[in-house]
Regions:
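Carbohydrate-active catalytic/glycan-binding domains of CAZyme proteins
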Residues: 1, 51-354, 391-393, 438
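C-terminal outer-membrane/trafficking sorting elements
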Residues: 11-15, 19-22, 26, 499-583
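Bacterial N-terminal signal peptides
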Residues: 35-48
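Non-cytosolic beta-sheet module surface loops
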Residues: 76, 199-201, 359, 370, ...
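Hydrophobic beta-strand positions
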Residues: 85, 187-188, 268, 336, ...
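Solvent-exposed strand-loop boundary residues in beta-sheet-rich modules
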Residues: 87-90, 154-156, 214, 269-271, ...
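Lectin-like carbohydrate-binding module/patch detector with strong preference for beta-trefoil
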Residues: 351-493
Length: 583
């Protein structure tokens, strides 16, 4: 994060008004580091809900995700160095204790950063040599006197008897006469396996220096490379193919809904630069191609980190939540690459298209129950039958949020009565852009997805983890149940396409006493015709074959228990289907 060392430089230029403005901005930055964690903890304790990608999601300056055993960790700005963890990359929980006990810190910091009060900034963590190397920033408001330190631990599990943070002292420090500012550390390895540290802020820009891979400290601080200048900070470098990509932040940080922070990128064939944007402008000359900026209620994103697992790259970053008066939040975006090998950062995890949505718990699919495609129809889980009413069209409305419409009739999935409350049900309705008709989709570590209603952020689940077909989907607080996880498959309707059949009548409706009649009407049927009745578990409970002519109706006389049933009418002409309710 910025440090107001730039204030002195502006006064030397004789521009006191700019200096005062910069100092005010720096006060906001420093203050936000202190109040952000307090705001988050207060909100978390007051709400007492666990939400999809959220849970304890208050975060500022998050580190790269690092994994210890089966648990994912992120460290953020805060007193003592605040940590948060997740087992699925969806729900996050505060760590039980900070790296350093609140109110304490390594004694060497007092000499390097007089006035330091224990609020550490923008940490970064990397696993190497059998232990975790945690880099942290120490600074104070209104000063360019700063330092980056290092602590190590063999495990991130606080319950382990081997859990112990050991401080390794200073990595790099700066003083009032320095031309760079020692904050915002980040690490990367080049193609030759060399380890590098990038750091710096608005004052002096971004620098890179090589580290000893065993100690994690600089090989030669006298050898440094200037990578970016002109109001930059929060650097991070990754390698893809033959290029290195330097991500930076420009704009105003730490001002809540008024933040203009945005992530930019340049690339180079060498780890030491020069880094050029898409237009060929050097990041040392103010260049930078924007890849993540304010969009909707996601305001001022910054401090990116990249974590790859199972072929997917998660981009950790913070943003200011417009729906919550600018509270800082953690978000995970998705890294993709365009045809010219430039990075694309998006919160969209699902491409536009038609999908079948399958429960990880029951194996059943989202189903517009009744297959009529009318407003108010329940969205339930049903046995997979390749029906049109089991196909769903996904359309991104931005920021990982989607409109989901049924292939039969085009009506949208919505939360009934736009309720944000527990147990609210899903149904079909005409899309009008309401928040209760939009769903935020997050990707869990196992490749499944979580659907959260934008209106209240509760997630879609099969109530009670039911295995029964016909159970209407509803909302609940996220708890990690497989009944809240969904997989997406390409929507493939069988060759004998199931369809809405207004000409196929079944009466009476609802069916009583297990007897009903199928009216063949003016259907064109060829070959042998088969009528099948399947129960809610997909089991065949009745079948009959007949020649279509001269027969114009079929009577099914079978004692059926109360419930929902699927009637199939098949012939050489195709497959027709309809759901019935037996009372």
């Amino acid at each position: 994060m910025n440090n107001s060392t730039h204030y002195t430089r502006l006064h030397h230029l004789g521009d006191a008004s700019k200096a005062t403005l910069f100092l005010q901005v720096e006060w906001l930055r420093s203050a936000w580091r202190r109040i952000g964690l307090v705001f988050f903890l207060t909100s978390y304790l007051a709400i007492q809900h666990v939400y999809a990608l959220q849970g304890a999601n208050g975060a500022h300056d998050p580190s790269t995700i690092v994994k210890s055993g089966n648990v994912y960790w992120i460290f953020t700005t805060g007193d003592g160095i605040y940590g948060m963890y997740s087992t699925d990359l969806v729900s996050w929980t505060p760590g039980p204790k900070p790296v350093f006990a609140i109110g304490t810190w390594p004694s060497w910091i007092n000499a390097k950063v007089p006035g330091f009060a224990g609020n550490f900034w923008a940490p970064e963590c990397k696993f190497m040599n059998g232990k975790y190397y945690l880099y942290y920033s120490c600074s104070t408001f209104g000063s360019r006197v700063s330092a980056i330190g290092l602590a190590t631990n063999v495990t991130l599990d606080p319950a382990s008897p081997n859990y112990k943070w050991e401080d390794q002292g200073e990595v790099v420090s700066t003083n009032a006469s320095s031309t760079v500012n020692a904050i915002d550390p980040a690490l990367f390895e080049d193609a030759d396996g060399k380890l590098w540290l990038t750091y710096g802020s608005f004052f002096g820009g971004i620098r890179a220096t090589q580290l000893d891979k065993l100690t994690g400290k600089p090989l030669d601080l006298a050898t440094q490379y200037a990578l970016a200048n002109g109001g930059v900070e929060a650097s991070y470098i990754i390698r893809n193919g033959s290029y290195y990509y330097l991500f930076i932040n420009r704009g105003a940080c730490c001002q809540g809904v008024n933040s203009t922070y945005n992530v930019q990128v340049g690339r180079s064939a060498s780890p030491t630069g020069p880094y050029l944007d898409k237009n060929g402008v050097s990041l040392n000359s103010g260049g930078g191609t924007s890849v993540l900026a304010t969009s909707g209620h996601y305001i001022g994103p910054g401090q990116v980190g990249f974590y790859q697992e199972n072929g997917v790259t998660y981009v950790s970053h913070h943003y200011y939540e417009g729906f919550e008066n600018g509270a800082p939040k953690l978000s995970l975006a998705n890294l993709q690459w365009d045809a010219a090998q430039w990075p694309v950062l998006t919160r969209d995890w699902v491409g536009a298209g038609r999908y079948e949505i399958t429960s990880r718990n029951s194996g059943k699919v989202w189903d517009a129950w009744g297959c009529t495609g009318v407003a108010g129809q329940a969205i339930a889980q049903g046995n997979k039958a390749s029906l049109t009413c089991q196909q769903w069209d996904f359309t991104s409305v931005g920021n990982g949020e989607y409109k989901i419409t049924n292939a039969l009739g085009g009506l949208a999935a919505e939360v009934a009565s736009c309720s944000p409350y527990l147990a609210a049900k899903l149904q079909l309705n005409a899309y009008s852009g309401l928040l209760c008709q939009q769903f935020k989709i997050e990707r869990a570590n196992d490749g499944s997805y979580v659907f959260a209603s934008i209106n209240g952020n509760r997630v879609v689940e099969v109530p009670g983890a039911s295995q029964t077909a016909g159970v209407q989907l509803g909302l609940w607080d996220y708890n990690g149940c497989t009944c809240q996880r969904w997989t997406l498959g390409s929507a493939i309707v069988t060759a004998n396409t199931a369809q809405k059949l207004p000409e196929l009548a079944i009466y009476p409706s609802p069916v009583t006493q297990g007897k009903f009649t199928v009216d063949l009407g003016n259907l064109t049927l060829t070959g042998q015709v088969r009528v099948e009745v399947l129960n809610g578990q997909g089991q065949l409970v009745y079948q009959q074959q007949f020649n279509p002519k001269p027969q114009v109706e079929v009577t099914v006389d079978k004692p059926l228990a109360a419930g929902m049933y699927l009637v199939h009418l098949s012939s050489n002409s195709g497959l027709l289907t309809k759901k019935i309710v037996v009372q």
